[in-house]
């Protein structure tokens, strides 16, 4: 099983400004990459207990597909990005706003309850810090 996530889902939801050339998905299987006439498809493994919640069906040109919600895509990205090792919540400011070029207003609109549910499923220090950072940002952004 797999669902569209990471950069592809972040772009789908308008959270990152860049055009994504590769369809990025998360799977309970193994890491894979396929170069096809239709494009490049990559699959990043995620442990089964971190696989849900946070997915929804979307209608695409080729039919319906399963994709991460904005909150799930962000948690998937943070958890799978091995280059990002936050020492504190403050590290998320540079990562989200400078490295990922995410708009603070759009981040403030994320569903806090859904993000908390996703982060609880991850049971990870990185995603817990993400939820706390975004909760703090929403309070100061209001």
Task: Label each residue range with its predicted role.
Residues 54-142:
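Hydrophobic alpha-helical interaction segments
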Residues 1-50:
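Short gly/ser-rich loop at a beta-strand->alpha-helix junction or flexible surface loop bordering the NTP-binding
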């Amino acid at each position: 099983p797999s669902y569209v996530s990471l950069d592809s889902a972040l772009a789908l939801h308008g959270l990152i400004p860049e055009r994504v050339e590769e369809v990025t998905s998360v799977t309970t299987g193994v890491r894979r990459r396929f170069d096809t006439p239709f494009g490049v498809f990559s699959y990043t493994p995620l442990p089964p207990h971190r696989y849900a919640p946070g997915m929804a069906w979307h209608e695409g040109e080729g039919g319906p597909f399963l994709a991460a919600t904005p909150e799930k895509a962000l948690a998937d990205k943070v958890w799978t990005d091995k280059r990002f090792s936050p020492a504190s919540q403050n590290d998320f400011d540079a990562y989200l706003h400078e490295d990922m070029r995410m708009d603070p207003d759009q981040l403030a609109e994320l569903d806090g309850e859904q993000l908390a549910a996703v982060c609880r499923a991850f049971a990870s220090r990185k995603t817990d810090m993400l939820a706390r950072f975004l909760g703090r940002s929403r309070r100061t952004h209001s």
